From Swiss-Prot:
It is found in: Bud neck. The gene is INN1. The modification Phosphoserine is found at S392. The lineage of its organism: Eukaryota, Fungi, Dikarya, Ascomycota, Saccharomycotina. SMART domains: C2. It comes from Saccharomyces cerevisiae (strain ATCC 204508 / S288c). Required for the ingression of the plasma membrane into the bud neck at the end of cytokinesis, leading to the separation of the mother and daughter cells. Stimulates the synthesis of the primary septum (PS) by CHS2. This is Ingression protein 1.
């Protein structure tokens, strides 16, 4: 069994003995009375006697023990056969290690079957026991809390203050400055290595007080390699890229200068009367055909083409305007004063009946023909008695109205 002492927090151990089975029967003529006894260190608990329990007793016995770190985590379980007038007879016993129960979850616990033994390791049945350990949380008083806080403050005050970042043995060097000076350091280091000068770790760069540019050490001093920037050595490829960039810019500047000269000559050709042309000598005349071939232009008659385009546009617009006028119908003549007076007098005359012949007479000198009446159809003549097609009411075939009945006197 385990011999270690539990050094954890103190708590309460709950022991629940459920039942036992296959116990030997010590009474030959009757069923035996069974009792249970539990012991942890100096603490002993005994159950009530179960009368006539026999070989498969059911205990349902619960007991609690206060566990402290000084108590050995071991429990003894003993089962007895109780006799009224005599001392009880031991049926079986077992030892249970409590560390499994103490380390288990308090909500689940630890339960299993344990074997009982008699003297000489003889089998005496099994017993089912459930163990649950609930630790006690220590409660600190205010005085204890204050002591703990004071102790923590004193320990933090005794700690040394770390040095500031500025108090380093090497000066600060920016990355851009390091890129510019690293190739020079590499070249000087290779040259001095061939000469056999010694190397030592230190600060290669010294920041001047007037500016923030890094300056190499004196040529008389031994070469000093920087300890922190050794990985950035050997960047000679950056110099090659700079050379190519410079060559490209020089070529572009040359082409721009040639184009500027050609543009000036073209302006002189277009504006011969300008002040710039008067200042130049006659010997600076330009061959137009050669200039056109050099530039890649077929002709320089931009002004003539523009004039021709303007003339074509003007002719097209004028012809389009005339054709548009021909398609429109002719406008009516402008009315005169006499026509206006006649029209107003005709509007002021009163209305006449339809049977008056003067309304339909178009030969009157004062009548003004309305444009809408020229194309209107003629009205049919009114029916008269002389017309042969006219039928009187008497000769009509339609039924007549029924006469009213005679009045009674």
């Amino acid at each position: 069994m385990s011999e270690e002492v539990w050094n954890g927090n103190q708590g309460i151990l709950s022991v629940y003995v459920s039942k036992a089975r296959d116990l030997p029967n010590l009474n030959k003529l009757d069923k035996q009375n069974v009792m249970l006894r539990l012991r942890i260190a100096h603490m002993t608990r005994a159950s009530n006697t179960l009368h006539r329990a026999g070989q498969n007793p059911v205990f349902h016995y619960l007991e609690k023990f206060d566990i402290t770190p000084e108590i050995k985590p071991l429990m003894y379980v003993e089962v007895y056969c109780d006799r009224r007038k005599k001392s009880p007879l031991p049926i079986g016993r077992c030892e249970i290690d409590l560390l499994n129960a103490i380390r288990a979850d308090p909500k689940e616990g630890y339960c299993t079957w344990y074997e009982l033994k008699r003297s000489g390791d003889e089998f005496a049945g099994t017993i089912f026991i459930e163990l649950t350990f609930t630790p006690k949380v220590p409660r600190l008083n205010r005085d204890d809390l204050n002591k703990e806080m004071d102790r923590l403050d004193s320990s933090m005050a005794m700690r040394p203050i770390p040095p500031l970042p500025t108090e380093s043995e090497y000066d600060y060097v920016h990355g851009s400055t390091m890129r510019q000076i690293t190739p020079q350091c590499v070249s000087t280091s290779h040259e001095d290595k061939d000469e056999g000068q010694p190397y030592r770790n230190g600060n290669v760069f010294s920041m001047s007080s007037k500016s923030d540019t890094a300056v190499l050490a004196n040529s008389n001093d031994p070469i000093i390699l920087p300890p922190t920037f050794s990985a950035s050595m050997g960047t000679t490829s950056t110099l090659e890229t700079n050379d190519t960039a410079i060559s490209n810019t020089s070529n572009t500047k040359f082409h721009f200068a040639n184009l500027r000269k050609l543009k000036e000559k073209i302006n002189i050709f277009k504006n011969p009367d300008s002040s710039t042309n008067n200042c130049q000598n006659e010997s600076n005349k330009v061959d137009i055909e050669a200039l056109q071939k050099a530039i890649g232009v077929t002709s320089l008659s931009y002004d003539e083409d523009d004039d021709d385009d303007d003339e074509n546009d003007a002719f097209y617009s004028s012809s389009h305007r005339v054709s548009h006028n021909y398609n429109q119908p002719p406008l009516p003549p402008i009315p005169t004063r006499d026509d206006m007076s006649n029209y107003s007098s005709s509007r002021n005359t009163p209305l006449v009946r339809r049977d008056r012949p003067s309304r339909l007479d178009s030969s009157s000198p004062n009548s003004h023909p309305h444009p809408s009446g020229l194309n209107s159809p003629k009205l049919p003549p009114l029916p008269t008695t002389s017309n042969s097609n006219f039928n009187s009411r008497k000769n009509s075939m339609s039924p007549t109205r029924k006469r009213p009945p005679p009045r009674l006197s």
